Each structure stands twice: as C-alpha cells, then as structure tokens.
C-alpha cells in the first residue's frame, strides 16, 4: 500500500503477471487491514473455528503460487514489451485518429490494456474485427447503470463523463507477444476505418 492503506493485484490469466486460474494479492503495511484481509479470505474466520464476519474462500493455492514464482522473473521483460508496443502505436500515428492513453509524469504505465477513445468506437471495433484484429470495449455499461448496482445510485444521478468514457473507449491488441508488424497492421486498419 505505497499510495494508500492497501493495494490489490490480480493474477487472472489475462493479466500482466498471470497464474493458471483466478488469483490475487493484497499488500498493506497496516496490521489491522492485513488481519481483516486474512479473515475475509478464509470465510470470515481468524482461527478456523469462529466466524466473526461473512467472508470468502479466496486463498491462493500452492500451485498458483508456484506458477507465479516461476513467471515473476519474466515480468519486467513482459512490461517492457508492452511499453514498446504502446510507444509504437503512438509513434505510428495512431493519435491522428483516436485519443491515446495520457501519460502520467509520476508513473510508468505497464499497459495491461491499451485503451483509446473515439466517438466511433463501435464502428471501429467492427472494422477491426472484419480485418481479424481483436478490439473491444470492456465496460460499455457503467456500474451505476448495471442492474445489480443501479439501486445503490442516488435518484437522478448523472455521470456524463463516465457514460462518455463507456461509449467511446476501445481496447486495442496489447501484450508482450505483440509484434511490431501487428502494431503497424492495427494502426493502418484504424487509419483506414476512420480515414
């Protein structure tokens, strides 16, 4: 938790550091937060006998931990490859057609996803799919409009920026295995689709 009380990491197979199935970790330097996280991950129990709150069965098993330990030395190289692909997208003129991810001066992006913005995101996704290039909008319906959570939103809640981001975002191909030729092909396909 360098920036807050705790930090979370997902090790889902599609993430930058993947395990074989679902997995994750929480880091903190707060003993009370650490105790609560440990309790929640084991059904809400501190001692396997008394359940003091409703929890989950969310322990990282030894096989997943072993896979992560084997893959961890690859992470820096994979992240460098993702950054190189992102740099190539930007250098190739992609920004002439879509809004690129904005750099943050105090951080170094590892580009789990490469998300661009366009008022024609759905049209662009269809054009890329026709060329065999995978691209998608991940969060088209914002959480305050999802059936399971809409009841928690205050009546009349308007989040125009959130709704705009949901409509206009599109994740382009990204990963450490992405080649320069694939990046160039995607940039060319975006240019052709959006003119």
Question: Where in the sequence are the language-model features?
Answer:
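Conserved active-site segment immediately N-terminal to the catalytic lysine
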Residues: 1-20, 47-52
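Short beta-strand-to-turn element immediately C-terminal to the catalytic PLP-Schiff-base lysine
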Residues: 2, 10, 24-29, 69
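Conserved beta-strand and immediately adjacent loop positions that scaffold enzyme active sites
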Residues: 16, 23, 113
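PLP-dependent aminotransferase class I/II
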Residues: 29-195
């Amino acid at each position: 938790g360098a920036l807050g009380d705790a930090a979370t990491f997902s090790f889902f197979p599609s993430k930058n550091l993947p395990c074989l199935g679902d997995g994750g970790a929480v880091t903190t330097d707060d003993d009370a937060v650490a105790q609560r996280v440990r309790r929640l991950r084991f059904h809400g129990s501190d001692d396997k006998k008394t359940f003091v709150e409703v929890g989950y069965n969310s322990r990282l098993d030894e096989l997943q931990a072993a896979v992560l330990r084997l893959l961890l030395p690859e992470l820096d190289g994979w992240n460098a490859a993702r950054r190189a692909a992102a740099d190539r997208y930007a250098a190739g003129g992609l920004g002439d057609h879509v809004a690129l991810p904005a750099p943050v001066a105090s951080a170094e992006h590892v580009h789990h996803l490469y998300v661009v913005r366009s008022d024609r995101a759905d049209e662009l996704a269809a054009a890329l799919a026709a060329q065999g290039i995978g691209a998608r909008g991940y969060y088209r319906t914002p959480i305050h409009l999802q059936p399971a959570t809409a009841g928690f939103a205050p009546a009349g809640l308007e989040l125009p920026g959130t709704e705009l981001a949901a409509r206009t975002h599109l994740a382009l191909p990204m990963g450490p295995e992405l080649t320069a030729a694939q990046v160039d092909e995607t940039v060319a396909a975006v240019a052709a689709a959006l003119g």
